[in-house]
């Protein structure tokens, strides 16, 4: 007789990982959570809204995971997973409510799975949403031993008449960029081609550790700004860089004019460029130091930047909007 364990699936290790995961998930629970982990589904009670709209998003971490495997550092990529999802739904003015994760592997190691979920828990705490469920799939022969994949799904909420969809953007509005923490979770297939030695020194740290800096979560500062200002459009700068993401906030035909010298370029991007990437390709791949963009009235720009600084963020007036063709113009 052949057992499930002999086929490559260790049920006992699965039980152990669930126990380790529960303690991390419980730290994220908010008032709307109605049940604990372990049921067939997570339940969440909607807060009191007049005309609520649920806003959802899903994403993964991509090949940044390979850096984590090679550095044997697993507790940060979970933050990336949450960030990629909640920053997306934030673009429409949605407050994150809850999150679910999916972890797949060839051979389950409970301690590694727990570290991954520790990162997810940390990301949920940063974005004030609850981790109410998830799935860990052990698939021997499908993934190589030691390899994991992680993806997530976020649900947020917004009042229907407060949804930000770019319809109020006007010619002459300005663009405020909020600093990123590094490449975030995009461009890593290219990075892995260029950076072979992850233990090489970069500004007093191993470059592998620098590249594992978690994606910045913008929920708290942006939600505070939404309470005070008329923010007309927002963009999460992910894969495709400036060119792909900034025009996504436009409902009409506008062009975003971005001044490359309006903010300091982080050294990690200068270093990557020095390894052989053309500048235009950099802006079409990476966030180039700006992880989130706000479109606002010019009169509000100075105060928004001041408020961002007071909240510990770095904000810059990086450009403006003009009539065009849903494009980006770098100057």
UniProtKB/Swiss-Prot annotation:
GO molecular function: ATP binding; phosphoribosylamine-glycine ligase activity; phosphoribosylformylglycinamidine cyclo-ligase activity
The entry's keywords: ATP-binding, Cytoplasm, Ligase, Nucleotide-binding, Purine biosynthesis
InterPro entries from the UniProt entry: PurM-like_C_dom, PurM-like_C_sf, PurM-like_N, PurM-like_N_sf, PurM_cligase
Coiled coil: none
Annotated GO CC locations: cytosol
EC number, UniProt record: 6.3.3.1
Pfam families: AIRS, AIRS_C
EC primary class: ligase
Keyword ATP-binding: yes
Pathway(s) this gene product operates in, as recorded in its UniProt entry: Purine metabolism; IMP biosynthesis via de novo pathway; 5-amino-1-(5-phospho-D-ribosyl)imidazole from N(2)-formyl-N(1)-(5-phospho-D-ribosyl)glycinamide: step 2/2
Disulfide bridge map: none
CDD domains registered for this protein in UniProt: PurM
Catalytic activity: 2-formamido-N(1)-(5-O-phospho-beta-D-ribosyl)acetamidine + ATP = 5-amino-1-(5-phospho-beta-D-ribosyl)imidazole + ADP + phosphate + H(+)
Subcellular location: Cytoplasm
BP GO terms, sorted: 'de novo' IMP biosynthetic process; adenine biosynthetic process
UniProt family annotation: Belongs to the AIR synthase family.
PANTHER family: TRIFUNCTIONAL PURINE BIOSYNTHETIC PROTEIN ADENOSINE-3, TRIFUNCTIONAL PURINE BIOSYNTHETIC PROTEIN ADENOSINE-3-RELATED
Protein name from the UniProt record: Phosphoribosylformylglycinamidine cyclo-ligase
Source organism per UniProt: Clostridium botulinum (strain Okra / Type B1)
Originating gene: purM
